Swiss-Prot record:
Name of this chain's protein: Large ribosomal subunit protein uL29
Similarity annotation: Belongs to the universal ribosomal protein uL29 family.
Pfam families given in the database record: Ribosomal_L29
Naturally occurring in which organism (per UniProt): Corynebacterium kroppenstedtii (strain DSM 44385 / JCM 11950 / CIP 105744 / CCUG 35717)
Lineage top rank: taxon: Bacteria
Cross-referenced SUPFAM superfamilies: Ribosomal protein L29 (L29p) (SSF46561)
Length: 76
């Protein structure tokens, strides 16, 4: 079963690590879509899992922009 990264784990990452994870997830999604189009994709569920991971990362980034949560090590 393909499982994504829980939000609480993403909240523990720094902004740079989140950006890196986001870039990697977008690359993986591109590759999965390409495999799906060519009929080589064996795990269709992985597409949805990666999409949800991207959404979670965007959510954590937005929470920090709004001040709803802080990056680890940032004590206010």
């Amino acid at each position: 079963m393909a499982t994504g990264t829980p939000a609480h784990e993403l909240r523990e990452l720094s902004a740079e690590e989140l950006t890196t994870r986001l870039h990697e997830a977008k690359e993986e999604l591109f590759n999965l879509r390409f495999q799906n189009a060519t009929g080589q994709l064996t795990n269709n569920r992985r597409l949805g899992t990666v999409k949800r991971d991207i959404a979670r990362i965007h959510t954590v980034i937005r929470e920090r922009e709004l001040g709803l949560s802080s990056a680890p090590g940032d004590e206010a």
